[in-house]
Amino acid sequence: MASSHVAGVEIAEAVPLAPLTTLRIGPVARRMLTCTSTEQLIGVLRALTADDEPLLILAGGSNVVLADDLTDLTVVRIANTEITVDGDRVRAEAGALWDDVVVTSLAHGLGGLECLSGIPGSAGATPVQNVGAYGAEVADTITRVRLLDRRTGEDRWATTEELRFGYRTSVLKHSDAVIVLEVEFGLDAAGRSAPVRYRELATALGVEPGERTDPLRVRDAVLRLRTGKGMVVDPDPDHPDHDTWSVGSFFTNPVVTHADFERVERIARDAGAGPVPNYPAPDGVKLAAGWLVERAGFGKGYPGEGARARLSTKHALALTNRGQATTADVMALAGTVRAGVLDVFGIELTPEPILLGCVLSVP
């Protein structure tokens, strides 16, 4: 095994993956190689790719759903965690905890990442998904991303234009041929927050949408909002809050045409469901997936006590493991919710996490 000759790499056999994901579900991997430096990560990936070995690349485990039967595989654990600051630039290795990146930037008086506080997972995952929350996304501040192309072995920095960021996506999302090694962010050296675009957050801060304010105040407000929705990972193993055992929002907010939006408005009006929350989007109108889920009949906590997988009791868009769920349980619940929204509103929701070895069936 060529990878075993990469100095310092920890190799373990028969590794349960459930504790390494925020959903707390996963198979037992045949073996896992943990890379604590970028050099180790490059060496291992080059060696295993040359061996043509099937791999699972895992870092924070916060936005991935692993099939129950993915057992005969090798996992490469990304655990390089260095964060460096140079002027208004912050560089984070792929395995750094995302919230540590946010905290480090604020400690150096840099604004721009505060709206993304409390998001679980690693820095390397953020450009893959174009992670976002409360009116901000990492594409707003990323300046470049260091990548390893497993097909050629090339290690280089890619521009934001090459990454083709979109709503919760990038060119990196649907392939593991290119692996993120480091991410660089360009932030506000004047210590101002990013413009507060999200109405709920602006209200909590007492500012007008579009205003800037103290980024530490923004972080505090975001953490309060996220905690109230069960969207901050609970670290207490003895008294876990199962509402936090999730991948966050399971579905993205759909962007629809103006004609489809008017149709959804008519359906909601006829059902007495009230005004439809909506936001302008470059290609149409963005709808609130959580609102669609609840108005389609799937309230918080659905399907109720005793279910191994259910919607969070705090946030209808989070599908949660209540302690004993399997991936099959979660995917069945996701399929039921997706089919219900399609039936009521004619809108097909798109899953946000990466699904490995499991498929969300088309209703």
Swiss-Prot record:
InterPro entries reported in the protein's UniProt record: FAD-bd_PCMH, FAD-bd_PCMH-like_sf, FAD-bd_PCMH_sub1, FAD-bd_PCMH_sub2, MurB, MurB_C, MurB_C_sf, Oxid_FAD_bind_N
Pathway in which this enzyme or protein is active: Cell wall biogenesis; peptidoglycan biosynthesis
Major subcellular location class: cytoplasm
FAD-binding PCMH-type domain ranges (all copies): 25-201
Catalytic activity: UDP-N-acetyl-alpha-D-muramate + NADP(+) = UDP-N-acetyl-3-O-(1-carboxyvinyl)-alpha-D-glucosamine + NADPH + H(+)
Gene3D superfamilies reported for this sequence: 3.30.465.10, UDP-N-acetylenolpyruvoylglucosamine reductase, C-terminal domain (3.90.78.10), Uridine Diphospho-n-acetylenolpyruvylglucosamine Reductase, domain 2 (3.30.43.10)
GO molecular function: FAD binding; UDP-N-acetylmuramate dehydrogenase activity
Entry cofactors: FAD
Key words, A-Z: Cell cycle, Cell division, Cell shape, Cell wall biogenesis/degradation, Cytoplasm, FAD, Flavoprotein, NADP, Oxidoreductase, Peptidoglycan synthesis
Gene Ontology biological process terms in this record: cell division; cell wall organization; peptidoglycan biosynthetic process; regulation of cell shape
Active site: 168, 249 (proton donor), 352
EC number(s) recorded for this UniProt protein: 1.3.1.98
One GO CC term, this protein: cytosol
Enzyme class (EC, first level): oxidoreductase
Subcellular location field: Cytoplasm
PANTHER family: UDP-N-ACETYLENOLPYRUVOYLGLUCOSAMINE REDUCTASE (PTHR21071:SF4)
Protein family (similarity comment): Belongs to the MurB family.
Known function: Cell wall formation.
Protein name as annotated: UDP-N-acetylenolpyruvoylglucosamine reductase
